[in-house]
Amino acid sequence: MGRVLACHGSIDRFSEGEPIRALGIFLFAGQLGTLLEQTGWVARVVLLMLLAFSLFSWALIFQKSRMFSRMNHQTALFLRIFRSNKFLPEPKQMGSGGSPLEPVYSAGYREVDSQLRAGNPHGKVTSLNAVTVSMQLAAAEEVRRAEKYMPWLATTGSVTPFIGLFGTVWGVMDAFTGLGAAGAASLRAVAPGIAEALITTAAGLFTAVPAVIAYNHFLHNIKDLGSRMDGFTLEVAAMIEKLYPGQRM
């Protein structure tokens, strides 16, 4: 019975602590709002700039995450279909248009088809190098498409800390100005300037850190994509070598 009462008491203490924590969060939010109201126009401009950088960066992060997730799924499906065929299937039969391997394969298939239709008497692929180059060009285009807007993340990660640092310096200058106007050292005189400095510093870091992490993660995905397309190009070239043996340039 005593153990039950002890458990009951701990539950009561836990339930009583929840409103206290909620009240603490509410008070912190209220204090943050008060600090923002006390900031000057320079700090507000800095915060608005950082907010714009942050919003666009997060939108780009979500868009890139969905894009790479879809690419990985469609690429796995595309490779499974391709490897299940003993001959070169037509691109429209692959049924996986969301994979970056699809335009790479289509470029190689068109080059093979054009060589077979060129009227050579033996119906052979005369230049395997031309097929490989056409696929490599298509792969380079897909890499460029995957790299779209990546410089924005790099710029956000490198520039926003300095924007926040500018707000920090301005806030410290404002604090010294308030201290000089008050004529005596007091917390009330320096609080607005210190608040500006701390808020802009935190905002700059909050904007820069996710952008840098996302940039490095997506850069790794792009390098992996390039490696997979290079490997797929060699795989297609090897299949063409088996299907159309003979003298080539």
Predicted regions and their residues:
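Short, strongly hydrophobic alpha-helical membrane anchors
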Residues: 2-39, 186
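Transmembrane alpha-helix/interfacial motif
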Residues: 39-91
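Residue-level signature of catalytic and energy-coupling elements of molecular machines
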Residues: 40, 58, 91, 105, ...
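N-terminal membrane-entry
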Residues: 44-47, 147-154, 196, 200
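Residue-level signal for the membrane-embedded core of alpha-helical transmembrane segments
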Residues: 46-49, 53-56, 160-163, 167-170, ...
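Predominantly long cytosolic amphipathic alpha-helical stalk/bundle segments
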Residues: 71-166, 172-186, 213-249
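Hydrophobic alpha-helical transmembrane segments and adjacent short intramembrane/lumenal linkers
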Residues: 183, 188-197
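Hydrophobic alpha-helical transmembrane segments of polytopic membrane proteins
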Residues: 197-211
